[in-house]
Amino acid sequence: MFTLDKTYSATYEEKKSKFIAYLCAYSEFDILLKQLKNEHPKARHIVTAFRYINEIGQIVEGSSDDKEPRGTAGKPALHVLQGSELINIGVLIVRYFGGIKLGTGGLVRAYSDAVNLALKECELIKYEKRENFKFTSSYSDLGKVEYHLQKIGITEIKKDFLSLHVEINLEATHKQIEELKAYLKN
């Protein structure tokens, strides 16, 4: 399975209709949807689809046709995510109607093609399950700890500065956490 770490977009045109597909990390999905509604107030539709792994390891999927004929927009976008083995990803497709009806088959192809075009722009990352890890560091060691975290590729860090030490909460792969534990023992 694969995921991505930033938002990508591509524009596809079919019979004067414009389809702007945005692929994003699922954690950014709701924020991006609100942003697109503000940025594209004249768009006829904003179709969505998503896939993510929940806290108990199940794949959760969903889609919305946003007033397009049922099954012609969100489902085809979701099928592209499934077929490409993408996870923890959302896709949002902004459609501007060009005045020519595409028909149900045309809509299915157009939405699928828009997502596939955006996928060609992406740098996909192999998905690795991430875990939470919490530890403390003295203020004097914090710089060295931060350097080591950066060195092993851990970037999702939350620090709480307490009176005697710093509490660090992070999210990383199992391998990264094991490397960090080995470093902290020394």
Sequence positions of predicted segments:
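Conserved mixed alpha/beta catalytic, RNA-binding, or beta-rich assembly cores of soluble enzyme
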Residues: 67-83, 94, 107-111
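Non-DNA-binding regulatory cores of transcription-related proteins
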Residues: 156-174
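Short glycine-/aliphatic-rich beta-strand segments at the starts of folded cytosolic domains
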Residues: 124-139, 168
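C-terminal regulatory domains involved in ligand/effector binding and gene-expression control
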Residues: 1-71, 174, 182
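Short amphipathic alpha-helix segments
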Residues: 136-155, 179
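Glycine- and acidic-rich phosphate- and metal-coordinating loops
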Residues: 87-97
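Helix N-cap motif at beta-to-alpha junctions
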Residues: 26-29, 138-142, 171-178
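Long, charge-dense
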Residues: 105, 112-130
